[in-house]
Amino acid sequence: MAVPKRKVSKSRRDSRRAQTFRLEAPNLSPCPNCRTPRLPHRVCPNCGYYQGRVVIQHEAEAAE
């Protein structure tokens, strides 16, 4: 059975584990309709468009 040759310090152990839990920035793409950044494959929160169609009616547009 494998046995560690030396004790691994807490800082060495934690710095190794830190690579596992690293967060990545969200991948944003511009909305083709209004050019605001949005998550890919999701409805634009600004204009409500997805793949050239209105999916969400905003309150300002619905009142008109």
UniProtKB/Swiss-Prot annotation:
A single cellular component GO annotation: large ribosomal subunit
GO molecular function: structural constituent of ribosome
Biased composition (Basic residues): 1-15
Signal keyword on record: no
Superkingdom in the source lineage: Bacteria
Swiss-Prot/TrEMBL keywords: Ribonucleoprotein, Ribosomal protein
Coiled-coil parts of chain: none
SUPFAM superfamilies linked: Zn-binding ribosomal proteins
Stretch list, region Disordered: 1-21
One Gene Ontology term from the biological process aspect of the record: translation
Entry similarity comment: Belongs to the bacterial ribosomal protein bL32 family.
Protein name (database record): Large ribosomal subunit protein bL32
Gene coding for it: rpmF
